[in-house]
């Protein structure tokens, strides 16, 4: 499909959403004269912010909200689905053609792509890569699963500067001929098992980041490669990385040891030590800078000065010398475990707020932090039921609350000066919040109103 052909087509957007992706997609199509229907199971009230953002085009849009109409799917030339909609959705069987905002973007994009996926650490890594690459490529752009649709900056692309895309497994699922110049898999944990039939399907979707790549390099965590990805054929050079101790595998590999970065056992540079949760994104950024011949001294400075990004082990404020951290992006147990370990103190002064919606995961990894967390503060939810079973099995006391407000107030009440209150849910957010970002913002508002 050519850009000029958009104006002759009927598009149906399935899932406007609240995070900006549906709005950017709609604007991209409407500016090019598309005939557009937007359908979403959410109501007009729930979608008010997104609808208001499209107010300039209201005469060109027909909305079907609170339901889907089969006839809209039958009549559309192209259905553009939200990545979170499962491919076996009953309405999609009536579609003539199915795309996503990412697949549409890739049809028209001419910029080289650095693509990042993984269960956790994606957003931190792409944020670091953006800062590092900006030193050499002023026209670099950042988009994808980080909350910025690449369609929103399509008209600003120069056709030559690198484009950094963060991609979830859901976004990769529909990409059959994806061909970045650098593809990166940060790590793989059991996740989204409420979406996938099994873990193998999750791995297959993750592998789509590199299986059709024809130039450049693939960067994969050594353990993930050994366990899951070595069975997939790669047409390009595979380079592994290790956080600490390289796995014994016959591949090129880079790793970090006390802030020093080694490639095939040769020192290539260093950066200041940091929290465990940031080590993997930092060492990957350092190696990508090395590969692209970016000034490593400058990259080292960027990494050393990096304080993190919103919602990912984000320091909110100190209230009466009690330190509050927002880690709402930790939606799986392993991520919460890493965050707790990153904040570990000598006298274990972490009060952990955890719990939420189940994603068909287990919480056995919580045994690794049982001796680090001083107080377990739980918010009701389907995942919380599983957490309670783990804690009770180990005879660990916990405190259960119906709301985030009550949990925060209790955490503050029991904390002494020097304590840490960490909000790291290890679960999805859908029972009490619009999404994980809404959850994080509510936590920060509650903290800012303390004291």
Swiss-Prot record:
Keyword ATP-binding: yes
Cleaved signal peptide residues: none
GO MF term (any one): ATP binding
Annotated positions binding ATP: 118-124
UniProt-listed GO biological process terms: cell division; cell wall organization; peptidoglycan biosynthetic process; regulation of cell shape
Alphabetical UniProt keywords: ATP-binding, Cell cycle, Cell division, Cell shape, Cell wall biogenesis/degradation, Cytoplasm, Ligase, Nucleotide-binding, Peptidoglycan synthesis
EC number, UniProt record: 6.3.2.9
UniProt pathway: Cell wall biogenesis; peptidoglycan biosynthesis
Localisation per UniProt entry: Cytoplasm
Catalysed reaction equations from the record: UDP-N-acetyl-alpha-D-muramoyl-L-alanine + D-glutamate + ATP = UDP-N-acetyl-alpha-D-muramoyl-L-alanyl-D-glutamate + ADP + phosphate + H(+)
GO cellular component: cytoplasm
HAMAP family for this protein: MurD (MF_00639)
Family assignment from sequence similarity: Belongs to the MurCDEF family.
Function description: Cell wall formation. Catalyzes the addition of glutamate to the nucleotide precursor UDP-N-acetylmuramoyl-L-alanine (UMA).
Name of the featured protein: UDP-N-acetylmuramoylalanine--D-glutamate ligase
Gene encoding the protein: murD
């Amino acid at each position: 499909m050519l850009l000029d052909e958009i104006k002759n087509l009927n598009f149906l957007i399935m899932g406007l959403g609240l995070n900006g992706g549906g709005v950017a997609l709609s604007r991209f199509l409407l500016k090019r004269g598309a005939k557009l229907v937007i359908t979403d199971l959410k109501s007009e009230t729930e979608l008010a912010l997104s609808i208001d953002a499209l107010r300039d085009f209201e005469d060109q849009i027909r909305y079907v909200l609170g339901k889907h109409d089969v006839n809209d799917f039958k009549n559309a030339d192209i259905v553009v689905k939200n990545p979170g909609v499962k491919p076996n959705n009953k309405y999609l069987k009536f579609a003539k053609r199915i795309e996503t905002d990412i697949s549409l973007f890739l049809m028209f994009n001419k910029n080289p792509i650095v693509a990042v996926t993984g269960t956790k650490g994606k957003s931190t890594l792409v944020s670091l890569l953006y800062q590092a690459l900006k030193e050499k490529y002023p026209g670099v752009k950042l988009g994808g699963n980080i909350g910025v649709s690449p369609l929103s900056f399509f008209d600003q692309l120069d056709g030559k500067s690198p484009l950094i895309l963060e991609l979830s497994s859901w976004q990769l699922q529909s990409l059959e001929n994806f061909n970045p110049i650098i593809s990166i898999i940060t790590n793989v944990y059991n996740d989204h098992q409420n979406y996938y039939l099994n873990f193998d399907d999750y791995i297959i979707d993750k592998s789509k980041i590199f299986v059709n790549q024809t130039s450049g390099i693939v960067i994969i965590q050594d353990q993930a490669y050994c366990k899951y990805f070595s069975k997939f054929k790669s047409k390009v050079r595979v380079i592994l990385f290790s956080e600490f101790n390289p796995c014994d595998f016959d591949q090129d590999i880079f790793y970090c040891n006390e802030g020093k970065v080694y490639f095939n056992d040769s020192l290539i540079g260093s950066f200041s030590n940091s929290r465990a949760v940031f080590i993997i994104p930092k060492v990957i950024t350092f190696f990508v800078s090395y590969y692209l011949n970016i000034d490593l001294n400058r990259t080292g400075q960027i990494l050393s000065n990096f304080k993190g990004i919103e919602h990912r082990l984000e320091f909110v404020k100190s209230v009466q010398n009690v330190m509050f951290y927002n880690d709402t992006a930790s939606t799986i147990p392993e991520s919460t475990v890493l965050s707790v370990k990153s904040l570990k103190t000598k006298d274990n002064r972490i009060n952990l707020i955890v719990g939420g919606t189940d994603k068909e995961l287990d919480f056995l990894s919580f045994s690794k932090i049982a001796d680090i967390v001083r107080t377990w503060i739980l918010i009701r939810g389907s995942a919380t039921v599983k957490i309670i079973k783990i804690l009770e099995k180990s005879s660990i006391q916990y405190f259960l609350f119906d709301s985030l407000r009550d949990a925060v107030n209790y955490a503050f009440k029991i904390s002494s000066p020097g304590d840490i209150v960490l909000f790291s849910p290890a679960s999805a957010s859908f029972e009490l919040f619009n999404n994980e970002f809404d959850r994080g913002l509510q936590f920060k508002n509650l903290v800012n109103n303390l004291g």
